[in-house]
């Protein structure tokens, strides 16, 4: 199986030993504590599950600035975005041991324990520098920029011990998986070549066929459909609805034992190219050999070029930095001429009128009225689940 990023073995920061974990939970109740923001809590969950291997905790300011600038820590570890705990809390001292409380669960239970190695102030200029490097914009209308700029100006760095996986395990018991669990499941399947498909949206015909194309062209053993379960921007479809629609699609339209449907506990960054590279890092940690990167991967609005998330792998990711390979996909759509889903670049003789194309707004309006999109665009079983959801909103 492909090695994890940056090490020979996966190093999840969740405390798996039950006795030790219970002792730490008891200790945490005696420690000074801070309430994390959602971004720092999501980072803790990802660190706990081994997704951000080989990191051992939150980055310090020097590493955060270096990673933002050139995707490498001060010591040379390749990593695409800073993994930080930035807060507005005061009174924390370097050398202290603190409990980190979960902002996303009732009662704010303890999520992790942190050994604080450094407490550093982050200037507005440094926030601006990092935001521009990560998101390629400083527009506060960009949801990632808005979130990053509001995180606080005190950066806490140091190793953490993760004690639970927040709400993800309880709310999505059949879907949430750690990188450790996914690697184990891939091994149990006996898969050697595995293609990952990232999604924060429901999957329509084009997405379904894209997974199939990648699997066939790469002669892969299986596909990992890996959905984001954390916070999105307003208007995006909730995870439970996406989960149900994707599972129905896989059940009806894919051969048995060729697809794993799982999810991960992270908030969407909308960082386009940089987030695509982060997706590659943690899919390698999951045991995947390939990641599908399509048009406007991890993007939002018009902030990124259609294929910036592909070209970053050629132009900015050093050779050998990742073992995982990228499957570069063009925009896919149903061809009326060929009666199948195709990549647009593969059919230069087609005009736009030869494809079944619908905007997201048009699809939402149809589903909200109980009208199914054309079967060339969306499977009827998927459309039914989405239509039921949209009609509850309109009601």
Pin down the residues of each PLM region.
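Active-site cores that bind ATP or allylic diphosphates and position pyrophosphate for catalysis
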Residues: 1-395
């Amino acid at each position: 199986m492909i090695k994890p990023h940056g090490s020979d073995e996966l190093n999840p920061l969740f405390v798996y030993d039950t006795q030790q974990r219970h002792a730490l939970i008891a200790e945490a109740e005696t420690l000074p504590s801070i309430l994390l923001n959602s971004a720092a809590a999501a980072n803790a969950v990802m660190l706990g599950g081994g997704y951000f291997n080989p990191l051992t905790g939150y980055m310090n300011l020097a590493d955060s600035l270096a990673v933002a600038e050139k995707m490498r820590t001060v010591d040379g570890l390749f990593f695409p975005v800073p993994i930080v705990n930035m807060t507005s809390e005061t009174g924390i001292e370097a050398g202290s041991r603190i409990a980190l409380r979960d902002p996303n669960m009732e009662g704010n239970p303890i999520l992790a324990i942190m050994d604080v190695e450094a407490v550093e102030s982050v200037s507005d200029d440094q926030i601006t520098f990092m935001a521009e490097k990560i998101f390629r914009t400083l527009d506060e209308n960009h949801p990632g920029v808005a979130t990053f700029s509001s995180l606080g100006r005190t950066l806490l760095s140091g190793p953490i011990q993760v004690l639970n996986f927040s709400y993800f395990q309880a709310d999505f018991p059949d879907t949430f998986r750690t990188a450790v669990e996914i690697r184990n499941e891939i091994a149990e399947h006996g898969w050697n070549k595995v293609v990952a498909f990232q999604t924060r949206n429901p999957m329509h015909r084009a997405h379904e066929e894209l997974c199939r194309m990648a699997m066939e062209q790469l002669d892969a053993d299986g596909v990992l459909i890996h959905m984001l379960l954390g916070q999105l921007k307003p208007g995006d479809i909730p995870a439970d609805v996406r989960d149900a629609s994707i599972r129905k699609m896989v059940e009806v339209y894919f051969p048995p034992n060729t697809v794993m449907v799982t999810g991960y506990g992270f908030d969407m960054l909308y960082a386009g190219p940089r987030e695509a590279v982060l997706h590659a890092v943690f899919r390698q940690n999951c045991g995947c050999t390939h990641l599908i990167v399509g048009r406007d991967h991890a993007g939002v609005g018009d902030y990124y070029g259609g294929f910036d998330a592909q070209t970053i792998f050629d132009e900015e990711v050093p050779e050998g930095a990742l073992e995982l390979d990228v499957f570069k996909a063009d925009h896919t759509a149903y061809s009326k001429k060929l009666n199948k889903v195709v990549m647009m670049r593969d059919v230069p003789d087609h005009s736009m009128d030869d494809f079944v194309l619908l905007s997201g707004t048009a699809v939402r309006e149809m589903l909200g009225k109980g009208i199914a999109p054309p079967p060339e665009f969306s499977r009827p079983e998927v459309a039914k689940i989405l239509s039921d959801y949209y009609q509850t909103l309109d009601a």
